[in-house]
C-alpha cells in the first residue's frame, strides 16, 4: 500500500483555498458580456472558449492538496451545469468568495460549524427572495432575450432557439449538430426522445461528450432481457456483414451479453449501443410499440410467439440517426410507414378521450407528442473548427438556460437579482457565529456585479456604489452598453433556476471546505515534494 500524507487544520484549509483560487481566478475572467476568453491546450489543436465549466474541467494542479480544493470547486461548476446547463462561472465565483471570507473568520477564531449553519440559513433566505421576484416567461421576445444573453449576447443564436421552441414547443426536443456549410440554420425533423441512456458508459463512442451517435442504424426492439450472446448472434451477424450500426432497446442487457458487446465495441468489431426499454409494465409495452411503428420494426415478444434466436430481417427498425447519452435516447427520422404512424397517433388520441385518470391522460399526451411531434435541429456553421466548437458550446448553454427560464421564470440579470437580495439579509439576526455566515453570503452575492464590471474595464467598487445609490430593484450596470439603466426593461435577464442553483451549489461546497480539518492523499517518494504534511 502506498504511503499517505496528511495535512491538518489551518494548513489544510489554506491548501484547499489555494486550489479553489487557481480554478476560480481562471474561470471568473469570462463572466459577463465583456468577459475574456481562455485558450485550452488540447492534443490536436488549441480550443478558445469562455465557457466556465469547460475551462474548470481542464484544470489539474500538480500539488495534490491544492488539487483537492480545485476538484471541489470544479464540482460546483459541474453540478450547476448538470442542473441547469448555465451559470457555472457565477457559481464558481460565489463559492470562492464564501470560502475565502469563511476561512478568514475561522482563522480569527469563529466556529466552523456555526458559520456553516449561518451560510445555509442565509442561502435559504436569498432563494426565497429570488423565487418571490421571479417572473414567468411568456412570449417569444422574452425567450429571445434569455437565449441571447446566455449565448454571450449573440442575437442570431437567441432568435434560432426561440424559433426552435416555437416550432416544437417549450418541452420539445432540440439538438445541436454540425452544418455542412458555414451558415447556422434550423431544421425540424420527425423524432422521438425517451429517458433511458446506455447500459454501460463503455458504449459511448465519443468519450469527451459521453455520447453515442449512429447514422442510419438498425434498431432491435424487444421486451426480453438479453443476458446471453447467443440470443443476438443472428442480428449481430447481419449488422456486421452490412457494416451498419445497431441500437438495442430491451428490458435489460447484462451478464455475458453486455461483457461481449463491450469487448467487441472496444476492439472496433461492432458499432452497437444498448439501452433499457422506457416505462414500466403495460406502459412499457405501449411505448415499445410506439418505437416500432416509428422505426418500421417489430417488438420481438414471446407474447406474440416471437423469439430473438429466430430473428428475421423485417423485425429490425431503421432511423436516420440515433443519439444516446447517460440519461436519454433520441431517435431522429424513423423509417416507419407514415400511414402506420398516423394510425398509431389516432389510436392514442382515442385513448386520451376515454381515459379518466389525469395521470393516464398526461402520459398518453406525452406519447402522442413524441410520436407525432418533431425534433428541432440547430445546424451550426463556422469558418474554422475552433470557431465551430466555441459556437456549439454557446448554443448548448443558451438552450439549457432557456429551458430553465421556461421552467422557473426569470429575474433581473447582470448580477442584480443576487445584489438586491443582500439587503434582505439585514433582517436576519442570528446568535453568535451564525451571523458571520450570514455576512459571508451577503458579501459573496455582491461579487458577480463587481466581477462583471471589472471584466468590462470598470472599477467594481464605483459600480457597486452607483447601484446602491438607486432604490429601484431592477437598476444596474449594463456591461454590454456601458450604461446604468433598468436592466429588466433592457432585456438583461437570467433564468431563476440558474441563479438559484448556482448559489445553492456554491453554499454547499463552501460549507464542506470550511468544516474540513484534515486532508489525506497518496505520497510518492520519487515524484512528490515534501510539504508541511505528515507522511505515514
Swiss-Prot record:
GO MF entries: ATP binding; ATP-dependent protein folding chaperone; isomerase activity; unfolded protein binding
Binding site for ATP: 30-33, 86-90, 414, 494
Annotated catalysed reactions: ATP + H2O + a folded polypeptide = ADP + phosphate + an unfolded polypeptide
InterPro entries cross-referenced by the UniProt entry: Chaperonin_Cpn60_CS (IPR018370), Cpn60/GroEL (IPR001844), Cpn60/GroEL/TCP-1 (IPR002423), GroEL-like_apical_dom_sf (IPR027409), GROEL-like_equatorial_sf (IPR027413), TCP-1-like_intermed_sf (IPR027410)
Keyword entries, A-Z: ATP-binding, Chaperone, Cytoplasm, Isomerase, Nucleotide-binding
The keyword Isomerase appears for this protein: yes
Superkingdom assignment: Archaea
Species for this entry: Methanosarcina mazei (strain ATCC BAA-159 / DSM 3647 / Goe1 / Go1 / JCM 11833 / OCM 88)
SUPFAM superfamilies given in the database record: GroEL apical domain-like, GroEL equatorial domain-like, GroEL-intermediate domain like
Protein name stated in the entry: Chaperonin GroEL
GO cellular component: cytoplasm
Annotated localization: Cytoplasm
Function of the protein: Together with its co-chaperonin GroES, plays an essential role in assisting protein folding. The GroEL-GroES system forms a nano-cage that allows encapsulation of the non-native substrate proteins and provides a physical environment optimized to promote and accelerate protein folding.
GO biological process, one term: protein refolding
Main location: cytoplasm
A Pfam family recorded for this sequence: Cpn60_TCP1
EC number: 5.6.1.7
Subunit composition and interactions: Forms a cylinder of 14 subunits composed of two heptameric rings stacked back-to-back. Interacts with the co-chaperonin GroES.
Family: Belongs to the chaperonin (HSP60) family.
Classification via Gene3D superfamilies: GroEL (3.50.7.10), GroEL-like equatorial domain (1.10.560.10), TCP-1-like chaperonin intermediate domain (3.30.260.10)
Amino acid at each position: 500500500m502506498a504511503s499517505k500524507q496528511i495535512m491538518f487544520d489551518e494548513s489544510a484549509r489554506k491548501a484547499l483555498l489555494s486550489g479553489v483560487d487557481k480554478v476560480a481566478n481562471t474561470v471568473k475572467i469570462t463572466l459577463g458580456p465583456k468577459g475574456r476568453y481562455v485558450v485550452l491546450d488540447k492534443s490536436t489543436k488549441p480550443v478558445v472558449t469562455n465557457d466556465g465549466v469547460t475551462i474548470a474541467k481542464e484544470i489539474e494542479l500538480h500539488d495534490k492538496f491544492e488539487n483537492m480544493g480545485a476538484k471541489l470547486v470544479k464540482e460546483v461548476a459541474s453540478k450547476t451545469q448538470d442542473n441547469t446547463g448555465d451559470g457555472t462561472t457565477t457559481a464558481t465565483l460565489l463559492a470562492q468568495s464564501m470560502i475565502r471570507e469563511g476561512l478568514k473568520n475561522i482563522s480569527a477564531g469563529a466556529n466552523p460549524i456555526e458559520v456553516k449553519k449561518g451560510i445555509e440559513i442565509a442561502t435559504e433566505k436569498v432563494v426565497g427572495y429570488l423565487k418571490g421576484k421571479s417572473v414567468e416567461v411568456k412570449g417569444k421576445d422574452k425567450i429571445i432575450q434569455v437565449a441571447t444573453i446566455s449565448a454571450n449576447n449573440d442575437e442570431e443564436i437567441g432568435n434560432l432557439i426561440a424559433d426552435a421552441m416555437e416550432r416544437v414547443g417549450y418541452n420539445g426536443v432540440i439538438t445541436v449538430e454540425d452544418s455542412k456549410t458555414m451558415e447556422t440554420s434550423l431544421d425540424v425533423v420527425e423524432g422521438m426522445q425517451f429517458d433511458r441512456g446506455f447500459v454501460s458508459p463503455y458504449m459511448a463512442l465519443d468519450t469527451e461528450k459521453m455520447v453515442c451517435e449512429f447514422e442510419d442504424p438498425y434498431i432491435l426492439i424487444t421486451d426480453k432481457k438479453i443476458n446471453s450472446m447467443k440470443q443476438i448472434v443472428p442480428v449481430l451477424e447481419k449488422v456486421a456483414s452490412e457494416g451498419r450500426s445497431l441500437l438495442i432497446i430491451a428490458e435489460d442487457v447484462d451478464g455475458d451479453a453486455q461483457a461481449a458487446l463491450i469487448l467487441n465495441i472496444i476492439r472496433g468489431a461492432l458499432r452497437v449501443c444498448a439501452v433499457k426499454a422506457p416505462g414500466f409494465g403495460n406502459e412499457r409495452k405501449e411505448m415499445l410499440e410506439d418505437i416500432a411503428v416509428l422505426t418500421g420494426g417489430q417488438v420481438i415478444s414471446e407474447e406474440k410467439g416471437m423469439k430473438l434466436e429466430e430473428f428475421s430481417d423485417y423485425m429490425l427498425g431503421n432511423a436516420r440517426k440515433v443519439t444516446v447519452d447517460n440519461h436519454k435516447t433520441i431517435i431522429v427520422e424513423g423509417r416507419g410507414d407514415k400511414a402506420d404512424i398516423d394510425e398509431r397517433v389516432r389510436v392514442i388520441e382515442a385513448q386520451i378521450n376515454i381515459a379518466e385518470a389525469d395521470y393516464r391522460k398526461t402520459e398518453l399526451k406525452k406519447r402522442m407528442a413524441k410520436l407525432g411531434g418533431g425534433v428541432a435541429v440547430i445546424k451550426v456553421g463556422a469558418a474554422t473548427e475552433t470557431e465551430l466548437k466555441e459556437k456549439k458550446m454557446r448554443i448548448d448553454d443558451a438552450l439549457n438556460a432557456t429551458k430553465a427560464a421556461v421552467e422557473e421564470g426569470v429575474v433581473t440579470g447582470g448580477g442584480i437579482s443576487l445584489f438586491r437580495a443582500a439587503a434582505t439579509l439585514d433582517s436576519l439576526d442570528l446568535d453568535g457565529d451564525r451571523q458571520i455566515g450570514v455576512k459571508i453570503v451577503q458579501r459573496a452575492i455582491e461579487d458577480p456585479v463587481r466581477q462583471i464590471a471589472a471584466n468590462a474595464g470598470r472599477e467594481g467598487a464605483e459600480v457597486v456604489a452607483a447601484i446602491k445609490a438607486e432604490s429601484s430593484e431592477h437598476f444596474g450596470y449594463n456591461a454590454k452598453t456601458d450604461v446604468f439603466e433598468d436592466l429588466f426593461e433592457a432585456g438583461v435577464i437570467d433564468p431563476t433556476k440558474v441563479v438559484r442553483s448556482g448559489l445553492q451549489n456554491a453554499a454547499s461546497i463552501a460549507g464542506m471546505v470550511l468544516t474540513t480539518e484534515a486532508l489525506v492523499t497518496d505520497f510518492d517518494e520519487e515524484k512528490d515534494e515534501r510539504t508541511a504534511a505528515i507522511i505515514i
